[in-house]
UniProtKB/Swiss-Prot annotation:
GO biological process, one term: methylation
Superkingdom: Eukaryota
Pathway the protein acts in: Mycotoxin biosynthesis
Assigned EC number: 2.1.1.-
Keyword Methyltransferase: yes
Function statement: Methyltransferase; part of the gene cluster that mediates the biosynthesis of UCS1025A, a member of the pyrrolizidinone family that acts as a strong telomerase inhibitor and displays potent antibacterial and antitumor properties. These compounds share a hemiaminal-containing pyrrolizidinone core fused with a gamma-lactone, giving a furopyrrolizidine that is connected to a decalin fragment. The polyketide synthase module (PKS) of the PKS-NRPS ucsA is responsible for the synthesis of the polyketide backbone via the condensation of an acetyl-CoA starter unit with 6 malonyl-CoA units.
Name this polypeptide is given: Methyltransferase ucsB
Top EC class of this enzyme: transferase
Sorted UniProt keywords: Methyltransferase, Transferase
Organism: Acremonium sp
A family per Pfam: Methyltransf_11
Family in the record: Belongs to the class I-like SAM-binding methyltransferase superfamily.
Residue positions binding S-adenosyl-L-methionine: D87, D121, A122
Length: 288
């Protein structure tokens, strides 16, 4: 696919995540906690985390998976197990670093003290050695990259033989579907706002094609509570990276009109306020 100049301007950049990082952490903790717990369970079921050599949180964001890992499995982890978070957005790794500092201040023996944050592209994990990881978690990552096969290949390269990769991918969610109103204002953004949804079969196929075995994929439904339509839409427009990137090309009048359209769309999807927005995440795992 050829990306036109105005579409390129609408793609999120690493710096777009800076303002979003803290709010994303709060939202994501609610949105993806069930899939995160399922992802960690997949890792532990296939290869007990009590014997982990290295655990990589690939595309870590602010460290939600790592935080859940340490909270749930921290006492079981071997003392020499290397813990690493990587993300292409420096603002997200800043959040990881803040979480580590806070955790160690509260408990000097916390496994957080061993967490290293690195700014890396998931398509080029050059500072992660071959066969150095026993477990890799890639939450809501691989199918959102420009080259999903390369992302999975890099995961496989860094995994030890017998190591486990657990991934997740959106089947769909209401709040991103709301963006279908954007082309009513800017028709040229129709391609840019198309979401990258997946299915159980697609995730299974991707993992098997990448060479992973004993692949299993499950569907996890989720709900995100909101207090009012206006607050949810304003948060979406102010902090969601894809939205922030698109709004660079909007005039103030266009932003006002977009807010109105988003409010109307949200009321169709979920008329009551407060209410719940719905979505579903695929969680899959495979062994190298």
């Amino acid at each position: 696919m050829i990306i036109q100049g105005n579409q390129l301007d609408s793609l999120p950049k690493a710096e777009d995540w800076e303002a979003f990082a803290e709010s994303y952490k709060r939202i994501a903790e609610v949105a993806v906690m069930k899939p995160v717990q399922a992802l960690l369970q997949c890792l532990d079921d296939r290869l007990p985390l009590s014997g982990a050599v290295g655990i990589l949180d690939n595309g870590s964001g602010p460290g939600i998976i790592m935080s859940s890992l340490i909270e749930r499995y921290g006492p079981q982890l071997p003392p020499d197990c290397v813990l690493t978070c990587v993300d292409y957005a420096p603002a997200m790794i800043d959040q990881v670093d803040k979480a580590r500092i806070k955790a160690v201040e509260e408990d000097a023996d916390s496994a957080w003290g061993r967490v290293e944050g690195k700014v890396l592209d998931a398509l080029d994990l050059h500072s992660i050695a071959d066969e150095s990881q026993s477990h890799i978690a890639a939450g809501l990552l691989y199918n959102l990259t420009t080259d999903p096969a390369k992302c999975l290949s890099e995961c496989k390269r860094t995994l030890q033989p017998g190591g486990v990769l657990a991934v997740s991918a959106w089947e769909g969610n209401d709040w991103i579907e709301m963006l279908r109103v954007v082309p009513l204002i800017k028709p040229d953004l129709k391609t840019a706002i198309q979401p990258k949804w997946s299915t159980v079969d697609a995730v299974r196929w991707d993992l098997e094609l990448a060479g992973f075995r004993e692949v299993h994929v499950q569907r996890i439904p989720i709900k995100i509570p909101f207090t009012s339509h206006a607050l949810f839409v304003d948060t979406l427009m102010r902090y969601q990276p894809r939205m922030v990137a698109m709004l660079r090309t909007f005039t103030e009048d266009e932003k006002t009109e977009l807010r109105r359209l988003l409010m109307n769309e949200m009321k169709v999807i979920c008329p009551s306020q407060p209410g719940m927005m719905s979505g579903a995440v695929m969680v899959g795992a495979g062994v190298r």
